[in-house]
Amino acid sequence: MARRYDKEIREFLKVYQEELIENVCQLVRIPSVAGEKEGTHRYGVECAKALEFCMRLAKEKGLYAENFDDYGVEIRLYEKPRKKRLLLAAHTDVVPPSGENTYPPFGGTVDRGYIIGRGSVDDKGPLMALLYALFFFKETGISPECDLRLFVGAHEEVDRKDIEYYLKKAGQPDFGIAADDDFPITNGEKHILWFRLKAERSCMDLWQELEADSQGIQFGIHSRSRRYGESRCKLRAKNERWAEFDARFPVSIPIARGKENIEKFAGEHAMQVEFLKEEEGYYISEKDGIPNLLLRLYREETGCEDAAYIMEGSTYARKFQIGCGYGAGKRNEKKPFPYGAGAAHGPDEAQNIDVLMQALIMY
């Protein structure tokens, strides 16, 4: 367990905490909203700058780094492969600024114990914690037996084709950990289906009825359990003859069956259905080896007995054959900002520095 290295970890933080914070701020100042390809830069110049920043920093810290055709960067602790590979994953791309911001969205401001700016929470702060976790091993000479790597992506907020490309080239790890959630661990993500129903007549009454059915019961995708969570279905847009829906449902219902049930509903109502987005979810028991280890580590470090949870969002974790999410946010944190501010994707996105340092200790 990491407790064996408590002294080394805390001494490392004393030396490098301020440097880590400054590097998060510098990365936040790169407005890396993924865009169209520009020359050799697959996701635009700013995303390329963010990847280059991470690659350069990794090399400065004595780590090994490789650019995977601008889809992302792989950072390695060891030059040569080892038997078991543990892959950490985070991303540099961000969603565009939104809402009324008190602080410059790409300012990388430190105030009231927070790093403020777009991407500080999602996912540049956690990314730097992971990078410095690898640097810790290099700096102290502590040598994990596993082949420890970090994937730095640049298209997570769009479609996660970046990590798909990387995994196709590098292969699946023995276990993957995405740092794009809240602690303690995310041990599953729900299936995601976006779909559009089209009719030849006005269906406003039916749309209202389906909008009220927030659990997808009429579509035949409702399920609820303590283990896998509960289905949710939201009407995204509509007019008289069409409506678009965003469905999130547990992996206890195969995604193919969910599609079949939606198609059946459409047929019964003389409608056409078009699936706009499809992402298969995952589940791993928190009692399994690595998830259980991570959960115990979290509880020992924080003194909290929080439980593992299933999320409706989508992260790199669903792209692993086996893996989970682990931090770096604090669930239900009350931040000292106006209502609606401070969260990921919101105005004045703000990463709690103490929470980030605690994440680094656990990584």
Descriptions of predicted regions:
Residues 83-152, 341-342, 346-358:
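Active-site metal-coordination/substrate-binding segment of hydrolases
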Residues 2-115, 144:
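Acidic/His- and Gly-rich active-site-bordering loop/insert found
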Residues 64-68, 274-275, 309:
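Short beta-strand
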Residues 12-19, 23-30, 53, 57-61, ...:
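Generic non-transmembrane alpha-helical segments
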Residues 155-157, 161-266, 279:
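Midchain, well-structured core segments that form catalytic/ion-binding scaffolds
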Residues 214-218, 225, 281-330:
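Active-site-adjacent substrate-binding region
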